[in-house]
């Protein structure tokens, strides 16, 4: 532990037919996987120079020799029955190691920038929780100074109700909301985005 702050990146192992499945219904499994690799690369570029400890949590198994440089990113496997339990466990692991501020992000966001993550750490100085709201009703970032187990329980993960239910759990604490951004889940999320044009050209 070289920093007091920890950035956790939740990632799915990039396997054909297992990632961006809703997007794949329109563009096919191969293009969906290509887009996911593109998003992984963008997430790495955004996070690699942030001044904090960084840990990648893999959905299935740790890949030693991949794009996440082990001199920058620690590596761990997610564990828990659903996304909420896996996030709760990741936060818990970090707080047990005495990190003061912990942020979790995913790898589904092209529009995420270092400024969003830096602002989240900064806002945790004066807020209990920071949330980056996603257009689909979920969130792309959550930052905590201590564990709030309720926010990870009894949620229909992947649905439009998640953020609303989470904020309801946090009515009695100070929450800062970051700018709203858009996750990449379905074709509508990328069809008018210039960064993805190369994936949508007729082949």
Residue ranges and their predicted role:
Residues 1-22:
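N-terminal nucleotide-binding beta1-loop-alpha1 segment
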Residues 103-105:
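Short aromatic-hydrophobic micro-motifs that form the base-stacking/packing surface
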Residues 148-167:
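Short, glycine-/small-residue-rich phosphate/pyrophosphate-handling segment
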Residues 51-74:
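Acidic donor-binding segment of Leloir-type glycosyltransferases
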Residues 110-138:
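Conserved donor-nucleotide/metal-binding helix-loop-beta segment in metal-dependent transferases, i.e.
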Residues 164-203:
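Conserved alpha/beta core of the MobA/IspD/sugar-nucleotide pyrophosphorylase nucleotidyltransferase superfamily
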Residues 34-52:
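A short, N-terminal amphipathic alpha-helix
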Residues 68-101, 159-160:
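Short phosphate-binding loop-to-helix
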């Amino acid at each position: 532990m070289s920093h007091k702050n920890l950035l956790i990146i939740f990632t799915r192992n990039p396997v054909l037919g297992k990632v961006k499945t809703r997007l794949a219904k329109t563009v096919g499994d191969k293009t969906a996987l290509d887009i996911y690799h593109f998003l992984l690369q963008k997430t790495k570029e955004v996070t690699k120079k942030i001044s904090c400890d960084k840990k990648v949590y893999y959905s299935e198994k740790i890949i030693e020799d991949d794009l996440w440089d082990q001199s920058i990113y620690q590596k761990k496997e997610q564990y828990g029955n659903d996304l909420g339990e896996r996030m709760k466990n990741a936060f818990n692991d970090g707080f047990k190691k005495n990190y003061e501020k912990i942020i979790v992000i995913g790898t589904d966001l092209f529009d995420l920038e270092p400024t969003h993550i830096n602002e989240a750490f900064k806002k945790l100085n004066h807020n209990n929780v920071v949330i980056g709201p996603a257009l689909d009703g979920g969130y792309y970032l959550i930052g905590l100074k201590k564990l709030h187990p309720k926010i990870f329980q009894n949620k229909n993960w992947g649905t439009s109700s998640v953020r609303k239910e989470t904020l309801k759990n946090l009515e009695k604490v100070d929450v800062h909301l970051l700018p709203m951004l858009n996750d990449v889940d379905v074709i509508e999320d990328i069809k008018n985005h210039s960064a993805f044009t190369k994936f949508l050209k007729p082949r």
